[in-house]
Amino acid sequence: MTSETEERDSTMQQDTTALMQLLTSVLQHDTVTALSFTDPWGTAVAIGAKKMETRSWPAPRKYWRGPLALHISGTLTAEAKWVCERSPFREVLHAAGYASDMRRRFMWELPLKQVIAIAWLEEAERISADFHVDEQERSFGNYLPGRYAWKFGAVYRLKQPVLAVGRLGLWQWTPAVSVWDEIQQMLDGLRAEGQVESHA
């Protein structure tokens, strides 16, 4: 039992450290590099269910190991509506508090035209025939050889999503003052918690 507790505490500490690294990096820039997603794929990343985003093109190396704002585009496509009702999307969306309006089929209450989270982009790896990915993660993307898996680390989900106009490819997002304040407050809180634990 002790070893399990120690392992859990170690994992939580690593998660906190990674989140602090993400938030600190965001505060060091005037803008944040952003990527637009179609939902529900973007929301799945924001809630931590989806760890990789598959694209036909790689993220340039200069953006690796840095923050990436997750923007949701303005429409819920027919394919997306269908996907929302299928496993594992349906389960992870419900678990995160999203629900469909049963009076109107497929009317999912998902964020649109908004930046909803900021993630740490680890790298973009070219997918090969022997690329390893678990079953659930594979169901979240298109892992055909030759495509690229954008791998995410820590993710900070904004308390209040921010309206924004997305673009193709990577683009620069200038957060509102309220976003900077929220991130600074979260970082200060994590630091305070760390100081308390270190003296416990």
Question: Model regions: which residues?
Answer:
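Structured alpha/beta reader/binder surfaces that contact nucleic acids or chromatin modification marks
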Residues: 4-9, 13-200
